[in-house]
Amino acid sequence: MTARFADTWFFLALLDEHDQHHRRVADYAGSSADLMVTTRWVLAETANGLAASQHRAAVAEFLQSMENDPNVKLINESDALYRRGLELFAGRSDKEWSLTDCISFVVMKDEELR
């Protein structure tokens, strides 16, 4: 089984039927046997992006389903991971990466993902 990192963009497109990339992401998610790796920071950022009342119930249900999905490896928060992400964030002023992006990059490196 191949492991792939799922970022906020992926989840926003998956959960928002009006997103221009929804169909492509939904098709991939529905047919892939890949192990999905993500972080609680990504899930929080996804929930923030879809916090409007019309999305809230579906997003909450989806986030809860991620907890027990055997095809999902959910990386928990830790002080060490946060500090490593913050170090990357602070050190790359030439980029417009969010802190969540930087934490994701650290996880992708640790997990040897693309």
Task: State where each predicted segment sits.
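Alpha-helix boundary recognition
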Residues: 30, 64-68, 90, 109
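Short, well-structured N-terminal submotif of metal-dependent ribonuclease cores
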Residues: 1-38, 51-64
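Short loop->beta-strand "edge-of-pocket" segments that line small-molecule binding or catalytic clefts
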Residues: 35-37, 70-73
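Acidic active-site catalytic centers that drive phospho-/nucleotidyl reactions
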Residues: 7, 45, 101
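Short glycine/serine- and small hydrophobic-enriched flexible loop segments
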Residues: 48-51, 109
